[in-house]
Amino acid sequence: PQAALRVCIETRACNERERFHVDHVALRLICTYRGQGTQWLPAHVIETSSGGGGSDAVPASMLQEIPGGAIAVMKGRRYPDQPDSGLVHRSPMAGVDSPRILAMVDIDFA
């Protein structure tokens, strides 16, 4: 199978927290170079909460974070042979005076 790649380096400055979601890609490699890392939830938390994303009503003790500088590989909705098994995650708040700097590589299979 062929793979399509999309490489992106961006800054994010938002005073509102993103909602939990799963990316519409097969795989995403992500690294936060500046600011707080991407927040994610273990699968067992999703199964007992509102059904796979979109809700922020989860116990703070269940929230996990990818450390800044770490490279993470996250499954998305289009991961082959395992649809809808992607990692539920969100970007944390980042103020205009302290934006996050992210590098992402999205991989999709044709």
What are these regions (language model features)?
Residues 9-13, 31-34, 42, 76-78, ...:
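Short, structured patches in soluble enzyme cores that scaffold and shape functional sites
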Residues 57-110:
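Catalytic core of Fe(II)/2-oxoglutarate
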